[in-house]
């Protein structure tokens, strides 16, 4: 990737280079090496990718880079943790929802559901063999004072409004799981007489928060600058950390002598993915989304699975189990 020549703060792939070839070569150099050069990191088993091609949201057919990830995951026995992608364009809500925060939250959630076909998974998050991660409206900043010009439209811990939604190819479960992506605020619209809808867009909160605090380029070469961000990339990075911890647990083989032996290391990437999914759940999302979106019992599970995947990851459930399991 390199800085975008026309959009400040954005990145683009190298011109005149096919991205799938660049990615294939990079992974091959990690695992196998290239030419006279040995493998750069042959012990690597989990790889985090947060790219999100905004012009290629999933509709029906898997992207070329998604197919490449499926092949790489199978051929090299790797776990790819991939961000679902962000849809940061403004959206509209009915004008009646702009009068108070409760109505605005409900209107935003319904709009997110009704426009889900336009907010599909971004490549390479459409890969079947990858663990695709969505974002929740959560971070560690604590209580904040929301200015009068902004709205906090998402209930704490709910799926973020900016996150891409499923389903995946062939109605597969995508995103697989959700994790903390950082809270995002939205600009409070000004309602004019005669309007039936108002536009709501993301507020700029990089300096003041909320969001996840991350390192950022500093002026004059300074190395201590941080900003607040939100996105599925943040969530994917946190899930990658949990995946690495699970690999360490499996490699340590720290079990009681009377326990069954752990599976062979060749199955560890698949096991780690299963553990992450198993430690996720809908929890209260099931009832709240059914009620607020007025879903009927016949279609609710299918529709909610497209929005929620397997649910929100609970890190406290990872690497542990009850004594009878």
What are these regions (language model features)?
Residues 52-54, 85-89, 136-139, 183:
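Catalytic metal-binding/acid-base residues of hydrolase active sites
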Residues 110-240:
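Extracellular S/T/G-rich loop segment that most often corresponds to the catalytic His/Ser-adjacent loop
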Residues 249-288:
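An often Trp-containing, charged/polar helix-loop segment at the C-terminal end
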Residues 19-26, 92-119, 152-156:
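Acidic, Ser/Thr-rich peripheral helices and adjacent loops at domain boundaries
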Residues 1-61, 268:
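Subtilisin-like peptidase catalytic core
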Residues 85, 293-325:
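Secreted peptidase-domain scaffold signal
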Residues 1, 20-25, 227-249:
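Active-site alpha-helical elements of protease catalytic centers
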Residues 48-50, 80-85, 133:
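Active-site neighborhood of phospho(di)ester-bond hydrolases with catalytic His/Asp-centered motifs
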């Amino acid at each position: 990737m390199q800085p975008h020549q026309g959009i400040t703060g954005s990145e683009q792939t190298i011109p005149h280079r096919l991205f799938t070839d660049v990615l294939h070569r990079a992974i091959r150099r990690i695992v196998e090496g290239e030419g006279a050069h040995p493998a750069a990191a042959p012990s690597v088993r989990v790889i985090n990718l947060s790219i999100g091609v905004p012009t290629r949201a999933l509709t029906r057919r898997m992207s070329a880079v998604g197919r490449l990830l499926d092949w790489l995951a199978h051929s090299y026995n790797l776990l790819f943790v991939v961000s679902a992608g962000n849809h940061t364009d403004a959206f509209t809500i009915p004008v009646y929802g702009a009068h108070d925060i409760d109505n605005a939250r409900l209107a935003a959630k319904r709009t997110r559901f009704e426009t889900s076909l336009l907010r599909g998974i971004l490549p390479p998050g459409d890969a079947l063999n990858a663990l695709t991660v969505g974002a929740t409206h959560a971070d560690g900043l604590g209580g904040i004072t929301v200015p009068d010009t902004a709205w906090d439209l998402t209930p704490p811990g709910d799926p973020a409004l900016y996150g891409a939604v499923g389903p995946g190819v062939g109605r597969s479960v995508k995103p697989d799981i959700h994790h903390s992506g950082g809270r995002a605020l939205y600009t409070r619209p000004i309602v004019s007489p005669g309007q039936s809808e108002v536009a709501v867009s993301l507020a700029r909160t990089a300096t003041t928060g909320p969001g996840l605090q991350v390192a950022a380029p500093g002026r004059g070469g300074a190395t201590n600058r941080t900003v607040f961000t939100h996105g599925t990339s943040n969530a994917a990075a946190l899930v990658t950390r949990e995946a690495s911890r699970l690999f360490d647990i499996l490699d340590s083989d720290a079990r009681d002598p009377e326990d069954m032996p752990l599976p062979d290391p060749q199955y560890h990437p698949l096991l780690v993915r299963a553990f992450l999914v198993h430690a996720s759940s809908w929890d209260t999302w099931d009832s709240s989304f059914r009620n607020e979106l007025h879903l009927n019992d016949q279609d609710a599970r299918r529709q909610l699975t497209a929005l929620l995947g397997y649910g929100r990851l609970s890190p406290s459930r990872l690497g542990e189990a009850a004594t009878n399991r």
